């Protein structure tokens, strides 16, 4: 209902003083405007024009509210409300019977004003008439005794101080008991089930004020009638504490639905029960849902707790396991530490024993070499070889050398090339003198003392190895890098280089014997560790340079005690075959392979044709800006030991014929030489060659090239086998020496040539194609490393630069004392083209440049690999000589660098024969012999392993 502000409350009557509720009469006026009855069309007009005319009639008075109640073709009805009833009467007088004129209308409009009546004003008259007609016997319960209120403001009937706006039945009862005693009061808004049953239509909003419905039943009908009469045409007014009053129209009617009847009450109760049951079910369902949700929540919490607990247990178990493992490791480390302490003493004793065995092996080797020298001294045709045996003994047994002889040799080493060498008779006398001196008792005593000193030095060196290993490794790398970038000694002219032939660029003593053109230039390096006490005076001048060279040196694998232990305790003489021949053509891809086997007194030869493809790496030469690559494919010769029996026996005749031809050819070579290098006996071998890489002292000893003895007819294979057994050229090298990754660079054998004479062309050094037979590698310079798979590439170093570690060796001999083979002098000398045999049948070839024949002296560095070390060497350049007097015999040492994987199955006892394209040229190649024949020159290379601490490689070149 409409809530209005009351300005004049003079006509208000009190309803309930406690709630400040009053009843104010409704002052309404009904205004009817009659429309004219005419057929003629009139101008249309609006209701607002008529209302404006009415307001002008009552001016200055005003209506509180005016609204259009009804509009027809006959009249227009307006309902107006004023403040008081007296004012309504005044307005009625002003409006009743008045005429309104509208513009455009020919006729006038008449106004009729009357008082407004309630909707149920006729109700008491009907009831009174019925009573009069004799309806007194009718039950009053059947009559309307309940009042229905609509539009009561909730806030006005709510308890004071409450935040809610819900009405209270007690307040409603108190307010309306002023008319009589109330029997029942019902507010449907307060019943939640009723709100569900009726759809929530028990209240509403009246201009922002929430209202409600109520049913009131009086006990007495008279009270009911009194209340109805009092509430007819009234408004409910609330007077505030501040004096302001608000009036609200309420709707008051008698109850026509019999709301308080028993049937209605019973229906409402049943519905309430149903609603209660539904509500209970809803509550239970809600409770169940809550319980399920709670259970799920608890389960999740429990799972999370279990998960956290498992994680904690797992972490605890891991920590416990780690602690247990640490305790175990601690328990293990303690016995290991004690065991290491216990075994350290035993290892020191073992090192001392190994050092002593090494010295004893050297003694035994010297004794054997002396016996060979004595035998060769008896042979008349082996006088030239006696000199080399003596030199070998001097190098090997430098600790026993006569200081006078050492001084003599050192003085001879600095002679000019014009100085002639001693005659063969003088050399023989020197050799005998040396042998006689070695057989003296004083020599034995000094040998014993020196051996004991050497043992102590080896023992002390082995103890300091482990401490200096890490320092030495870093220092060696720095020194190698420094030495690799440091320019070498500049190339001197022939006259100046003659004066420098006696200089020492490596460890040990340097003995140089220089003669004229047909001279022998030799350099011998003695073992420094065994000779430095007895030769302190002779080596004093070279100590400073040796200290510089030895600085940063890394210990080699064959110097270690582990290698010596393997060599002395586990190494056994190889039992595999030793003879195998193979021939190949230089240009053809298909080759005839010839295998020669020793069988009894003869040979057995197999011939078979095979396809071959070589993979080679050529040397790079840089001489005067010209680069030339040459490749030579030499036949491969394998010689097997008589121990390996042949499976085929059908070609013995051819083997015997080949053997006879070889013997005759060796005899021809011996007959052409002046000094009969090889024995006249055909069964003997011309030269013995073993590439040696001996074990050095662990502190500062370097390997020294030394000469070896010739093999005689009487000594034969057993002596060579025995030497191989005690030598260091064994399978141990292939298995242990590959562990050494870094060694100082060395360049050896630099020979000068005179500018005014034409330099000799370097000879062809033949290398063999390797044929794997029963998984055996048969080339002496061929090794396999476990980790590397590339082949080394040899480069010629630019002239004028030389590494500090280069060694010069120039042995020059008189024409009468040299070995000479004059064949077809008119032909051009061959160029040096060494082919280094690679593993698995692959070649490593090198080529030389034609600029070697120019007047400028060229230096050449051939980098190759041995035991995976960086070692530099130079080709041999002999002084130029006339062809007729071209008899030169020189000793050189080639250190070959290998980067290819070396195989451990190194065949030490293989004998190899090589045949060149020329049918008259043969090469007897083995681990003990290496002979290369050419039209103008021949090569004889021989060497021998001379113990654990010595190494040598002798190379003879005949022109």
Curated annotation (Swiss-Prot):
Localization (cell): Nucleus speckle
Gene Ontology BP terms: mRNA processing; RNA splicing
GO cellular component: nuclear speck; spliceosomal complex
Cross-referenced SUPFAM superfamilies: RNA-binding domain, RBD
InterPro entries per UniProt: AK17A/B, Nucleotide-bd_a/b_plait_sf, RBD_domain_sf, RRM_dom
Tissue: Ubiquitously expressed.
Domain RRM: from-to ranges: 145-253
Region spans: Disordered: 284-342, 454-501, 528-548, 750-771, 827-864
Modified residues (Phosphoserine): 671, 678
Biased composition regions of type Polar residues, renumbered to the chain: 538-547
A Pfam cross-reference name: RBD_AKAP-17A
Biased composition (Basic residues): 305-331
PANTHER family, A to Z: A-KINASE ANCHOR PROTEIN 17B, B-LYMPHOCYTE ANTIGEN-RELATED
Protein name per UniProt: A-kinase anchor protein 17B
Protein's organism: Mus musculus (Mouse)
